[in-house]
Amino acid sequence: MSKLTKSRKIRLAKATQQNRRVPAWVMIKTKRTVVSHPKRRNWRRSTLKV
């Protein structure tokens, strides 16, 4: 069992916050020209360099 340091925990939390979908109001405002954002990350497919 590995220990999580505070700095690593903060970086993981930041990565989780960045991994959100585009808000619905943005889709409405841009008339669905902006539907997804390119930096979206899947937990199985890609790894984090944390």
Curated annotation (Swiss-Prot):
The keyword Ribosomal protein applies. GO terms for molecular function: structural constituent of ribosome. GO terms for biological process: translation. Keywords: Ribonucleoprotein, Ribosomal protein. InterPro entries: Ribosomal_eL39, Ribosomal_eL39_CS, Ribosomal_eL39_dom_sf. GO terms for cellular component: ribonucleoprotein complex; ribosome. It comes from the Archaea. Transmembrane segments: none annotated. HAMAP family: Ribosomal_eL39 (MF_00629). Belongs to the eukaryotic ribosomal protein eL39 family. This is Large ribosomal subunit protein eL39. The lineage of its organism: Archaea, Methanobacteriati, Methanobacteriota, Stenosarchaea group, Methanomicrobia.
